[in-house]
């Protein structure tokens, strides 16, 4: 399972053609990384959330589903922001919004 496939990203952005697939794919990869960084997820937890590896003892099924739902919204929001503000993106505002979106799943750092 891919958390946000290219086809879903294009639907979210309301893009029908394949002319910008490469750009959207790059922005989608960046959006995923930005969201993982803001949520303070290490690579092991991110691979479980993104569906790259099987969930073993990291999360319960309910926790994983809730986290995936939140991450999906955050990734799509970030993708839309990066796509619409390619030239003048304010990354500080983006990160502050993502912190609020991802607050419930953010990992604590001590």
Where is each model-derived feature located?
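Divalent metal-cofactor coordination and adjacent catalytic microenvironments
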Residues: 1-110
């Amino acid at each position: 399972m891919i958390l946000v496939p290219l086809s879903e990203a294009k639907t979210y952005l309301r893009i029908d053609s394949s002319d910008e697939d490469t750009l959207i794919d790059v922005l989608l990869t960046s959006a995923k990384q930005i969201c993982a960084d803001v949520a303070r997820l290490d690579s092991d937890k991110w691979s479980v959330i993104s569906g790259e590896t099987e969930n073993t003892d990291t999360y319960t099924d309910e926790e994983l589903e809730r986290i995936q739902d939140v991450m999906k919204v955050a990734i799509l929001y970030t993708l839309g922001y990066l796509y619409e503000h390619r030239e003048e993106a304010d990354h500080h505002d983006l990160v502050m919004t993502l912190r609020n979106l991802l607050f419930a799943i953010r990992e604590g750092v001590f």
